[in-house]
Amino acid sequence: MLRLKNDRFIRALLRQPVDRTPVWIMRQAGRYLPEYRQLREKVPNFMAFCKTPELACEATLQPLRRFPLDAAIIFSDILTIPDAMGVDLHIAPTVGPVIRNPVRSAQDVNRLQMPAVEEALSYLFDAIRLTVKALDHRVPLIGFAGSPWTLACYMTEGQSSKTFLTARAMLYQQPDVFHTLLQKLTTLTIAYLNAQIKAGADVVMLFDTWGGLLTPSLYRQFSLDYLSQIAAEVVRQKNGRKIPLIFFTKNGGQWLESIANSGCDAVGLDWTTDIGQARRRVGDRVALQGNLDPAILLSNPESISTAAVDILKSYGQGSGHVFNLGHGIDPSTPIENVAALVEAVQNFSIKNEEPINSYYR
C-alpha cells in the first residue's frame, strides 16, 4: 500500500507531530469557484451532479488546483441517504432541499426503504474510487455523512429551516417514532461510511449541523447517542492504518467534553467557541478542527490573515489542530481571500518537527 505524499492532516487528527498546521475548508469544492459553476451547467439539477461520478470527482479536485490544501473532501451532499430511502427530494435553486413527502408518523417511518447501501449509493463510491486514482496519493480524501439527527430534521420538517420547529416538536410528541427513524438512519450511515472507507476514503466526518438547536438532554438522547453508536461501528483500521473520525456539531461548544468522549478522533468547532479554551477543556482526548468565522472571508486579505493567526496563537504550539472554517464557505467569497487564508495559515504555523510522510512508514 503506497503512503500518502502529504499526510499532515491525518497526523494532526491523530495528534502526532506535524511540520505545520494542516488546512482545508468546509465546502472547498463549490459555488465560489467559477470553474465549478461552469461544470455545474452540464447537468439539469444538483442531485444529478452528485450522482455523476466523473463530475463529482472533478469538483473534488478543483480547489486543489487553486490552493495548496492538505486534504480533499469528496463532492456530495448529506441528503444522499434520505434520497436512497425513498423520500421525494428536490433541491430548489433558491430554497435548498425540499422533501415533498415529509416523515411525520410511525406509518411514514415504516414506509422508508432500507436499501443495500453499496448498490443504492454506488455513484458516490465510484466517485471516491475515481478521485483516489486522480489524487495519486497526493493528499488524503475525506468521506462524510450527515448526522442522523440532522438528516431527520430535513426529513420531518420537509425543508430547510432556522429552527426546525416541526422536528423538535416531534421529539416531545412522538419520541419513540423519532428514535425509530434515527436508528434507521444510524444503521444506514454506518454502512455508508464503511463503504466510503472501502472505496478509498482516508478520513470520515459526520456533520451534525443542527445539533445545536437541542436542549442538553435532548442533544444527548437524540444526537450524541447515535453519533457514539456510529463511532463504535465504523471501520477505524484499514491495511494497518487508522481511519480518523471527525464529529462536527454546529453550536455544540457547550457539549465539547461530551463530544470528545463519544469515540471520535477529532471535534470540529464553529466560530463561537474559543479554540484555546476548547483545547484546555478536552486535553489530549481529541484533536480540534476549526474555527474561523466564514464571514471574515468577505472582508480583505489583511483582516483574514490577522484572524487566522489569532486562532493559531490561541490554539498554541504542538499538533492536534486542523485549521478550517467554523462552517462552510459562503458562495460569494472572493477567491483571492481564500488564497490569503491558506497562505497565512501555512506561513505562520511552520513547526519543522518531523518529515510529513512518516505516518505511512
From Swiss-Prot:
Site feature (Transition state stabilizer) residues: D77
Pfam families, alphabetized: URO-D
The keyword Transmembrane belongs to this UniProt entry's keyword annotation: no
Subunit and partners: Homodimer.
Enzyme Commission designation: 4.1.1.37
Name of the protein: Uroporphyrinogen decarboxylase
Keywords annotated in UniProt: Cytoplasm, Decarboxylase, Lyase, Porphyrin biosynthesis
